[in-house]
C-alpha cells in the first residue's frame, strides 16, 4: 500500500508585524518608542524600549499569517521596490547560498513543493500531489500540467529529471545546496510526461521540506540552462510569477510580471530589488519614498523608522549567528573553550541588538523541533580563559568577518568582530580582524586562511537537519569550522531517517551537545527578522525562512 502525504513538519514561527506609526510625517506620529530609548540609555533600557514598542503595537492591522485577497481595483501597473544590504551573488538557485540572491530567486522560480504563507508546512506547487512507498524510499510526484518556463519550455517530468540529475549525477563543485536538497537521492526516473519517481538511498524525514527550499530545489528551464552553459546566474529562467528583466550590478535587479503564469498573477507590474549597503542610507531611502520595503535593519535605526511613520514587521528568527573556530588550525579544544569563556555572550547580545535578538543557548532556535534547554554551552569565565590561554601560549588570533548586515546579524560582522576583539584583549589575546564585503568575504572563506570567522545560517525548511547538516558538509563555504567527525556524521545520518517525535528530537540534542563540548562554534544570537515598509504597502509577510514572496504584495 502507498500512503498519501498530507503535510509534514510544522515550524511554529510566530509572526508579529509591529505597527509603529501609520503613514504621515514624524510630527503626526506617536514617538513613544523613540522617547523610551533615549541616547545614552543602558542596554537594559534599550531592551525595555523594544519590548514596550512591541506591547504597544501587538494588535496592529499589519499582522498577517496568510495573504489576503487582493482588491479588484488595485493598481496593477505599479512598481514595488525592495532594498537590501548586499548585492545578490547570482540568480541561479543551484549556484548560490545567500539570502540576497534568494529574495529575487523566489519571485522567479518554484519547486515541486512549497511552504505555507507564514510557516514551513509543505504544500503542493509544481507537483500537485505525491505518493510515498511503505519503505519511505520511493516518492512518486504527479506534476501540474500546462506550466511553462519563462522561455516557453514545457515543464514536465523530463524537466524535473534534468534538474535533479544536474545536481546529482552531473553535480559541480559550485552547487552549494545540492547535498542539502538531493543528497539522499539515488535515482530520478520519468514514469510518463507528468509523473516522475524519485528514489532515495535511505528514508529522509525532511525530504519534502527540502524540495520546498528556495535554493537548490527550484526548477530551472533545461533549454535556458543549456544555452547559458549550465549557469543561469545572469540569465535566470523559472516558472514563477515574475520574470527577469535586467541586473545592474551593485545597484538593482529588475523583474516584470509573468503574464503567462499558471497560478494567481502578480499584482505589481514590476518588482525592483535595490542594493543599498549602508544601514542608515537604506532607512533614509525608505523614509523619503525612494523604496517601499527594506530589510537588514539594525536595532539602532528602529526609532528613526517608527518616528517617520513607517511599519516595522517583526517575525521570530529561524536563524543562528555564531563564531566558528577553524578546527584545522585551532586543533586544541581547550584553546577553543578558553576563547569562548572570554566572551560575555549575554552582555554582547544585549548591547548590540537592543532586544531584537536573543542569546543563543543552542544552535537551534527555541521554537524548532530538536531544540533542548538541556544543551549547555561554554559559560563566561574570563579568569579561567586567561589562565588557559597563557598556559597554551595563545597571544594572537586572526579573525575573518564581513562588513555588511546579515539577516542573522543586523549589527554587521565588523561591529560584532570588534566587540569580540575587546573581550579577547582583556584576557591577553590580540585579535587581528580582516573585514570584507560579502562576496569577497565568501571568497576569503574558501581559502581557509583564518583562525576564527563570524558566520550565520538562516533555516531553509524548518527542520533541525538543515542546521546541523552544516557541520557535516565537505564544502568549506558551508562548514566554515572545517569540522570533520565520523561519529557526528553517522549521528546526523541516523537522525534524518527517524520519524518526527521525541526520539528524533533527542538525537539532535545529542548532536548539539557533542559539538558544544568540543567548542566547534560559539553560538551568539538568534536575530529577529526585521523589515520595514511605507504605510501604504499591503499584504506583506516576512517568511520564517527569511524570504519575502512579493507576488501578492502591493501599494494601495
Predicted segments with their positions:
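Ligand/substrate-recognition segments at binding pockets and active sites
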Residues: 390-460
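Surface-exposed binding/hinge segments that line
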Residues: 177-224
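Ligand-site clamp/hinge motif
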Residues: 258-303
Amino acid at each position: 500500500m502507498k500512503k498519501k502525504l498530507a503535510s509534514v513538519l510544522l515550524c511554529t514561527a510566530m509572526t508579529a508585524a509591529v505597527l509603529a506609526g501609520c503613514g504621515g510625517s514624524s510630527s503626526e506620529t506617536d514617538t513613544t518608542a523613540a522617547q523610551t530609548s533615549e541616547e545614552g540609555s543602558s542596554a537594559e533600557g534599550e531592551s525595555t524600549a523594544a519590548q514596550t514598542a512591541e506591547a504597544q503595537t501587538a494588535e496592529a492591522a499589519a499582522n498577517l499569517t496568510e495573504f489576503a485577497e487582493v482588491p479588484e481595483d488595485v493598481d496593477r501597473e505599479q512598481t514595488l521596490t525592495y532594498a537590501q544590504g548586499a548585492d545578490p551573488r547570482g540568480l541561479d538557485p543551484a549556484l548560490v547560498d545567500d539570502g540576497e540572491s534568494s529574495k529575487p530567486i523566489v519571485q522567479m522560480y518554484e519547486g515541486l513543493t512549497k511552504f505555507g504563507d507564514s510557516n514551513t508546512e509543505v504544500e503542493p506547487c509544481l507537483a500537485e500531489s505525491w505518493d510515498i512507498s511503505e519503505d519511505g524510499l520511493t516518492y512518486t510526484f504527479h506534476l501540474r500540467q500546462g506550466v511553462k518556463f519563462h522561455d516557453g519550455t514545457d515543464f514536465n517530468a523530463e524537466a524535473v529529471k534534468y534538474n535533479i540529475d544536474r545536481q546529482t549525477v552531473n553535480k559541480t563543485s559550485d552547487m552549494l545546496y545540492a547535498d542539502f536538497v538531493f543528497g539522499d537521492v539515488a535515482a530520478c526516473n520519468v514514469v510518463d510526461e507528468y509523473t516522475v519517481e524519485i528514489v532515495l538511498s535511505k528514508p529522509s524525514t525532511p525530504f519534502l521540506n527540502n524540495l520546498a527550499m528556495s535554493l537548490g530545489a527550484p526548477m530551472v528551464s533545461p533549454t535556458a540552462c543549456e544555452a547559458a552553459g549550465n549557469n543561469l546566474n545572469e540569465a535566470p529562467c523559472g516558472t514563477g510569477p515574475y520574470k527577469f528583466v535586467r541586473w545592474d550590478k551593485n545597484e538593482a535587479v529588475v523583474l516584470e510580471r509573468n503574464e503567462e503564469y499558471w497560478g494567481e498573477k502578480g499584482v505589481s507590474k514590476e518588482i525592483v530589488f535595490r542594493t543599498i549597503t549602508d544601514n542608515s542610507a537604506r532607512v533614509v531611502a525608505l523614509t523619503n519614498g525612494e523604496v517601499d520595503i527594506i530589510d537588514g535593519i539594525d536595532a539602532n535605526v528602529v526609532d528613526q523608522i517608527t518616528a517617520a511613520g513607517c511599519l516595522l514587521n517583526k517575525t521570530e528568527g529561524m536563524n543562528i549567528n555564531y563564531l566558528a573556530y577553524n578546527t584545522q588550525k585551532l586543533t586544541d579544544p581547550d584553546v577553543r573553550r578558553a576563547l569562548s569563556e572570554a566572551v560575555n555572550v549575554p552582555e554582547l547580545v544585549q548591547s548590540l541588538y537592543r532586544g531584537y535578538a536573543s542569546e543563543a543557548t543552542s544552535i537551534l532556535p527555541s521554537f524548532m523541533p530538536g531544540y533542548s534547554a538541556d544543551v549547555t554551552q561554554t559559560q563566561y569565565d574570563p579568569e579561567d580563559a586567561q589562565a588557559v590561554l597563557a598556559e597554551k601560549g595563545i597571544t594572537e588570533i586572526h579573525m575573518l568577518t564581513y562588513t555588511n548586515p546579515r539577516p542573522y546579524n543586523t549589527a554587521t560582522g565588523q561591529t560584532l568582530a570588534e566587540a569580540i576583539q575587546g573581550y579577547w584583549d582583556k584576557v591577553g589575546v590580540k585579535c587581528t580582524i580582516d573585514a570584507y564585503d560579502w562576496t569577497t568575504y565568501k571568497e576569503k572563506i574558501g581559502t581557509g586562511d583564518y583562525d576564527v570567522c563570524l558566520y550565520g545560517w538562516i533555516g531553509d525548511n524548518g527542520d533541525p537537519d538543515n542546521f546541523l547538516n552544516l557541520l557535516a558538509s565537505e564544502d568549506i563555504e558551508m562548514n566554515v569550522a572545517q569540522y570533520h567527525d565520523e561519529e557526528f556524521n553517522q549521528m546526523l545520518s541516523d537522525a534524518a531517517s527517524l520519524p518526527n517525535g521525541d526520539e528524533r528530537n533527542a538525537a539532535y540534542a545529542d548532536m548539539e551537545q557533542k559539538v558544544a563540548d568540543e567548542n566547534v562554534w560559539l553560538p551568539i544570537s538568534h536575530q529577529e527578522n526585521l523589515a520595514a515598509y511605507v504605510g501604504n504597502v499591503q499584504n506583506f509577510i516576512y517568511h520564517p525562512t527569511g524570504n519575502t514572496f512579493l507576488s501578492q504584495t502591493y501599494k494601495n
